[in-house]
Every structure is written in structure tokens, then in C-alpha cells.
Design a protein with these regions (language model features):
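N-terminal signal-anchor module of multipass membrane proteins
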Residues: 1-70, 74
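Hydrophobic residues within the alpha-helical transmembrane core of Major Facilitator Superfamily
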Residues: 2-4, 121, 142, 223
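Transmembrane helix-loop junctions in multipass membrane proteins, especially transporters and channels
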Residues: 11, 67-72, 101-102, 149-160
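Active-site-adjacent bridging/hinge elements
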Residues: 25-34, 90-98, 191-200
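Transmembrane alpha-helical segments and their boundary/interface "anchor" motifs
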Residues: 47-52, 67-97, 103, 108-119, ...
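Specific transmembrane alpha-helix
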Residues: 50-66, 112-124, 214-229
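Long hydrophobic alpha-helical segments that form multi-pass transmembrane helix bundles
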Residues: 131-218
Length: 229
């Protein structure tokens, strides 16, 4: 988070300057690549920003609801509070995504929306003990894996994906995770088109999907476990 606030401590800008002088430098290319999202397959330092946010949400919940419990709040009251907070986060996410545009952008893939979608489920794991929490995290990841595999993949390029890109990426079982040709993408093609839109939703350029909040819930639970440790 500190790195994000300080724009990567200037490393991205420094790497960019060095690459202008020595564009073939493998070292500075590797440094610069850490400040961009990985191209679907892979992971960079920049890709860890959202998991860091969601981990801290779980960490904060461990303290927040203990305080509320000590103040005499019932479980029902705290769950209602968690649901209201979740709705506010989702509404704020839509507002920020829409910006100054004339049409409301019903997109639920930014970090606030993803936290909001998983927040009530995270609360249900609060104060349940490490075993239940670990099982919940495993279930979130395991059910995601099963859903992707059962849905299957495609050897054809997904929406917004070129044939050349497709040929260089997912194959065999991994094809189930192909960009814009997987079960979460199929859900969004149905779900996001339930909202009023100027044109039908076809794909997300970055491959981000609403149901990403399910595996992301595991990261939030890990934060909760750390906070309760």
C-alpha cells in the first residue's frame, strides 16, 4: 500500500528512463514489468495490490466486530451492519466507475465492489475458529476450481482476444481459465446484461469478472484469521 501511495517509490519511472537509454536491458525490463498487471497468465508485484487490500479488510474485521461485540451488539445487529456496509461499498464502486459519464456503469470488478460482494460472507466466518475459516477458504477456492473445470474451456479465442494470443496461452485443462471464455465470463454475459445498458455487455478488456469475489474471499478470510490470531 505504501508502494502504491508513493507510485512504486519511483522505480517504474526510473526503469522507464533507463529503458529509453538501454531498451534491451533485461534487468530494467524486469523491474518495469513489476509495475504493470501481468498479461492474464503470471503475477507481478502490481497484481498483489488488490489481494493486499482484501487481506487488510479481513484483518480489520477481526478487530472491528470484537469491539462491537464488547459494546453489546448482537450477532444479528452486526450482520445487518455488515450487509449495509457491503451495499454502500458496491454503490460507491458503481458511482466511481461511472464517474462523469451519462450512463451508469454497472460493473462490479473494482476493489470496492469485490470487497462489498464478499463482505457479508466474510462476516459469517468471523469468530468461527480457524478450522471453520480454513474450510471456508478452501471451499471458496475449491468450488471455483470445480466450476471452471466443469464449464470447460475453448480452443477458440475468447471475446476480445486474438487468435495469436489464444494460441500462446491456455491449453488442455488450463483452457477452462481462458480469458473471456470461462464460466465467470459466461455468468457476466448473462448477469451484467440484466442491467440497463446502451449496448450489450460482451467482455471485459482486462478479463475481470464479477464472481472473482468468490476466490478473493479466501484472501479476506486469511486476513481475518491473521487478525484473530
Amino acid at each position: 500500500m505504501v508502494s502504491l501511495a508513493f507510485n512504486g517509490f519511483g522505480l517504474a519511472a526510473t526503469a522507464d528512463l533507463h529503458l529509453k537509454v538501454a531498451p534491451d536491458s533485461a534487468f530494467w525490463r524486469a523491474v518495469y514489468a513489476q509495475w504493470e498487471h501481468g498479461a492474464w497468465v503470471g503475477c507481478t508485484f502490481w497484481d498483489l495490490i488488490m489481494p493486499a487490500f482484501t487481506f487488510m479488510v479481513g484483518l480489520a474485521m477481526a478487530y472491528s466486530y470484537v469491539r462491537r461485540q464488547r459494546e453489546g451488539h448482537t450477532t444479528a445487529q452486526m450482520f445487518r451492519h455488515a450487509c449495509v456496509r457491503a451495499l454502500l461499498l458496491i454503490a460507491l464502486a458503481v458511482f466511481l466507475t461511472t464517474g462523469t459519464g451519462k450512463e451508469t456503469q454497472w460493473i462490479f470488478t473494482n476493489v470496492l465492489a469485490q470487497i462489498g460482494l464478499g463482505y457479508p460472507l466474510l462476516f459469517l466466518c468471523w469468530n468461527r475458529g480457524y478450522r471453520v475459516q480454513a474450510l471456508a477458504a478452501a471451499a471458496a477456492l475449491g468450488l471455483t476450481w470445480i466450476a471452471f473445470v466443469l464449464h470447460g474451456g475453448s480452443t477458440a479465442p475468447g471475446a476480445g482476444v486474438t487468435a495469436a494470443w489464444s494460441a500462446q496461452h491456455e491449453a488442455h485443462l488450463a483452457a477452462a481459465w481462458h480469458k473471456n471464455a470461462n464460466v465467470f465470463h459466461a455468468f457476466d454475459v448473462w448477469f451484467l446484461n440484466l442491467f440497463p445498458r446502451a449496448s450489450p455487455f460482451v467482455f471485459n478488456v482486462g478479463g475481470y469478472q464479477t464472481l472473482n469475489f468468490i476466490p478473493n474471499l479466501a484472501t479476506m478470510i486469511f486476513g481475518l484469521m491473521a487478525g484473530e490470531w
